[in-house]
């Protein structure tokens, strides 16, 4: 019996050894798999909900998104690797000049943009340093639980984990001596943007070359798509080197807020003249407003405690469906003007005609039109049908000031952005935020803009009132948001402290500017 028992034991040991090898092989296989490989389910979710429409009616304008639910496939445990938060922004460590050396995006020809299309990306920027690990295909699933002024809540690290993750160790600083000290205020910066990149954004030294490859692809897609038929002549490159005061004076000379007045075809033939308000938008406050606030809907405004400061202004502009109830401490409760895109009017879920959100305020609507500003073509085929709801609202509330911005005004703003940017920008209209800023600069002596350029509370939460995360909401894909913000940064007359801690930019109103008088050259001898 002993030889048989010994043989049986040997077989058992051999079987255990084989199973051990098999388990080890499986373990090595999964641990060596590439965690940065794209996850199709994640990207398809982002394509459908966050950034770029593919065509026509699926266009997404910032501020009009429906509140989405996060897909089950995006598990929080897959967002982090080795305890490190996935920073979606390139920090450009080691060479602070690298990010500035973006090549001029203009072609040799005088015109660009021909035909159209679009895609979307989940995260705006990607790191090249090993210290920052970005999981491709994952949107910014950062847990939105911050203390006052964007500081992490007790028990959290200053670089937050995904939802439900335990406390993680802080990331190592990438060659701290290579960047100014302000870039490493680790106790103040939130998690979804690298210290170095946010500092560069405050300084206006970022470019599209730092964008995540997918977002760059989305931008190229829109440039080739050119839905609105943009044909722009570059007119030289000196404009991109204008100083802030020079740019302000140029904008004062060219920017004229214009709305539909019912005098142009096809509206004149449709009886719109008595329908539109008798007093033009630019003349509602003939003496001008002293101080105005433009409140962005960015998620970064949460936990800011800016509500009292915002309400102290003479007038407050808000966007689309952004509420105040329940958010008064951070955003205030005063609303004077509300800029709304055409989706707000056309989508029944917004209850535009009956909602109290759109009552007792000045309403200013807009819709993308062809670059040619052909009103007949626009009326026949708007991006979203805002004309019928506009008529219904005017008939029901004839005394409420309600205007539709003229397409020429919208595209005039786009021209100014492109002329003052060395790179090609997306051939799509500016964002509602940029439009609102320019409208208020024409009406107010001083404009305070909150969280257009992000503060230390920067987060991937798109809007403070919607549970939807996407880093692209900060830099855009459909709208040329990156270039808009760089231009506004050049105009800022406020302090760096306000920009960093409040996300506040201060802009002078056009009426307060003292610009040199341009005299025509005397050709007489």
UniProtKB/Swiss-Prot annotation:
Membrane topology, as annotated: Single-pass type II membrane protein
Organism: Rattus norvegicus
Entry's family note: Belongs to the glycosyltransferase 29 family.
Glycosylated residues, chain numbering: 303, 333, 521
Residue stretches spanning the membrane: 12-32
Entry-linked InterPro entries: Glyco_hydro/deAcase_b/a-brl, Glyco_trans_29, GT29-like_sf
Annotated S-S bridges: 249-515, 292-444, 462-473
Keyword Translocase (UniProt): no
UniProt entry tagged with the keyword Transmembrane: yes
Reactions mediated catalytically: a beta-D-galactoside + CMP-N-acetyl-beta-neuraminate = an N-acetyl-alpha-neuraminyl-(2->6)-beta-D-galactosyl derivative + CMP + H(+)
Gene Ontology molecular function terms on file: beta-galactoside alpha-2,6-sialyltransferase activity; sialyltransferase activity
CDD domains the record matches: GT29_ST6GAL2 (cd23986)
Cytoplasmic side stretches: 1-11
Name of the protein this chain belongs to: Beta-galactoside alpha-2,6-sialyltransferase 2
Protein role: Transfers sialic acid from the donor of substrate CMP-sialic acid to galactose containing acceptor substrates. Has alpha-2,6-sialyltransferase activity toward oligosaccharides that have the Gal-beta-1,4-GlcNAc sequence at the non-reducing end of their carbohydrate groups, but it has weak or no activities toward glycoproteins and glycolipids.
EC code: 2.4.3.1
């Amino acid at each position: 019996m002993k030889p048989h028992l010994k043989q049986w034991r040997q077989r058992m040991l051999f079987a255990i050894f084989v199973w051990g090898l098999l388990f080890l092989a499986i373990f090595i296989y999964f641990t060596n798999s590439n965690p940065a490989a794209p996850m199709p389910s994640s990207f398809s979710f982002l394509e459908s909900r966050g950034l770029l429409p593919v065509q026509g009616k699926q266009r997404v304008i910032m501020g009009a998104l429906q509140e989405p639910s996060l897909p089950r496939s995006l598990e929080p445990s897959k967002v982090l690797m080795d305890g490190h938060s996935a920073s979606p922004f390139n920090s450009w460590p080691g060479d602070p000049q690298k990010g500035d050396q973006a090549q001029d995006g203009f072609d040799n020809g005088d015109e660009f943009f021909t035909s159209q299309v679009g895609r979307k990306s989940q995260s705006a920027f990607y790191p090249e340093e090993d210290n920052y690990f970005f999981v491709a295909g994952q949107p910014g699933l950062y847990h939105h639980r911050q203390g006052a002024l964007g500081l992490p809540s007790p028990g959290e690290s200053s670089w937050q984990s995904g939802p439900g993750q335990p406390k993680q160790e802080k990331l190592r600083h990438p060659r701290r001596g290579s960047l100014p000290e302000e870039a490493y205020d680790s106790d103040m910066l939130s998690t979804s943007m690298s210290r170095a990149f946010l500092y560069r954004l405050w300084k206006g030294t970022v470019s599209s070359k730092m964008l995540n490859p997918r977002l760059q692809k989305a931008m190229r897609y829109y440039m080739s798509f050119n839905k609105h038929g943009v044909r722009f002549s570059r007119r030289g490159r000196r404009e991109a080197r204008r100083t802030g005061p020079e740019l302000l004076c140029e904008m004062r000379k060219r920017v004229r807020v214009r709305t539909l007045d019912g005098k142009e075809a096809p509206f004149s033939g449709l009886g719109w003249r008595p329908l539109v308000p008798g007093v033009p938008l630019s003349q509602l406050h003939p003496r001008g407003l002293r101080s105005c606030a433009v409140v962005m809907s960015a998620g970064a405004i949460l936990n800011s405690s800016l509500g009292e400061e915002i309400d102290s202004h003479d007038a407050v502009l808000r966007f689309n469906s952004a509420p105040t109830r329940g958010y008064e401490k951070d955003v205030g409760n005063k609303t004077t003007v509300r800029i709304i895109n055409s989706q707000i009017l056309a989508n029944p879920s917004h209850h535009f005609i009956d909602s109290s959100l759109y009552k007792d305020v000045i309403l200013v609507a807009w819709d993308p039109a062809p670059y040619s500003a052909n009103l007949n073509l626009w009326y026949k085929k708007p991006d979203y049908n805002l004309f019928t709801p506009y008529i219904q609202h005017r008939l029901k509330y004839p005394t409420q000031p309600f205007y539709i911005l003229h397409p020429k005004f919208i595209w005039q703003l786009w021209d100014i952005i492109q002329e003052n940017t060395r790179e090609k920008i997306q051939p799509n209209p500016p964002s509602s935020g940029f439009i609102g800023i320019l409208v208020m600069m024409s009406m107010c002596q001083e404009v305070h803009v909150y969280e257009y350029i992000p503060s230390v509370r920067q987060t991937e939460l798109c809007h403070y009132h919607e549970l939807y995360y996407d880093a692209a909401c900060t830099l855009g894909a459909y709208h040329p948001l990156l270039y808009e913000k760089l231009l506004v940064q050049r105009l800022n007359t406020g302090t760096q402290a306000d920009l960093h801690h409040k996300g506040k930019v201060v802009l002078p109103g056009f009426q307060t500017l003292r610009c040199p008088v341009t005299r025509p050259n005397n050709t007489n001898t």
